[in-house]
Regions:
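Short, solvent-exposed beta-strand/turn patches at coil↔beta or beta↔helix junctions
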Residues: 11, 87-134, 151-156, 219, ...
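Periplasmic peptidoglycan-binding/anchoring modules of Gram-negative envelope and division proteins
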Residues: 17-22, 102, 107-147, 170, ...
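Short proline/glycine-enriched turn/loop motifs at strand-loop junctions of beta-rich domains
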Residues: 24-31
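Solvent-exposed segments in extracellular or luminal domains encompassing
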Residues: 39-65
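C-terminal edge beta-strand
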Residues: 77-86
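Periplasmic OmpA-like peptidoglycan-binding domain that tethers envelope proteins to the cell wall
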Residues: 142, 146-247, 251, 257-258, ...
Length: 270
């Protein structure tokens, strides 16, 4: 029996099973070969082997092709060849898109690698793992980063700050095995701020509900939501969830209005 491999992710066949059928019949005037219909009494043909299974899971099917040959004297003969198709049908890999957040005034020009705290590194690691698998489904997929700063500070400073944030996220994703050319980055400075009504709406949907102290100090929470990098999956335009990590161990450092010390940020980033 012949064996061929097959793999499909979502609606895309990643590894197609193929084989070449060869046949020859003597003393015959006509022949047919299964679903291929009428064929010459001798010949060969390349066929694509598609399993009948459509559901996700392992694939292990035996496909049979029977050659029926006849002649004008009423004689007939048949021969069957079997091809076993083994592989898998898999769902489209999930890419968990969540925005990442930064402490006040980080990173800095002097310390451009500082400010991506552990909880946000974990968020990006999960995203990177999913995206690398997703590339098997769509090799042309890309990530688009949009970085922001809160409203405090001069416009030029915030433009630089958001650029540092975009670059830090890109560098981290590259360190996780994503090619740099797969990542576009745009820095918005303090433009396109989330307004307070939007932040209130986001908080109602956030599975990480804030403690009472942060509910009372809404101004600090609003500012914290605007110190972030959003992520878009292209070409689907699936956007990252803006869930603020209130339950993360380093959330206080992310949330506080004053700029935290370098030592505190280093301790939460390593």
């Amino acid at each position: 029996m012949l064996f061929r491999s097959y793999r499909r992710i979502g609606d895309k066949v990643i590894q197609q099973a193929n084989t070449t059928l060869n046949w020859s019949s003597t003393n015959s005037d006509a022949a047919s070969l299964g679903s291929l219909g009428s064929v010459d009494t001798s010949g060969s043909k390349s066929v694509t082997l598609s399993p009948t299974q459509t559901a996700n899971g392992p694939v292990d099917e035996e496909l049979k092709y029977t050659l029926n040959a006849t002649n004008v004297c009423g004689g007939s003969d048949s021969k069957t060849v079997s091809v076993r198709v083994k592989g898998s049908i898999e769902p489209v890999p999930a890419v968990l898109l969540n925005s990442v957040f930064f402490p006040t005034d980080y990173p800095t020009k002097q310390y451009p690698a500082l400010g991506l705290v552990r909880s946000q590194q974990e968020t990006l690691t999960t995203l990177a793992d999913g995206f690398k698998k997703y590339l098997e489904y769509d090799p042309d997929a890309k990530l688009s980063l949009s970085a922001y700063a809160d409203e405090r500070g001069p416009g030029k400073h915030n433009q630089t700050l958001s650029d540092l944030r975009a670059q830090r996220v890109k560098d981290f994703l590259v360190s996780q095995g994503i090619a740099a050319e797969k990542i576009d980055a745009t820095a918005h400075g303090k433009e396109n701020q989330l307004d307070k009504a939007t932040v209130i709406e986001l908080q109602t949907k956030d599975p990480n509900q804030p403690p009472e102290t942060r509910v009372k100090n809404f101004k600090a929470t609003w500012l914290a939501y605007n110190r972030r990098v959003d992520i878009l999956l292209l070409p689907t335009n699936a956007a990252s969830e803006r869930f603020y990590p209130h339950n993360a161990a380093d959330s206080q450092l992310l949330w506080q209005r004053p700029k935290p010390s370098r030592r505190a940020v280093e301790s939460s980033s390593n």
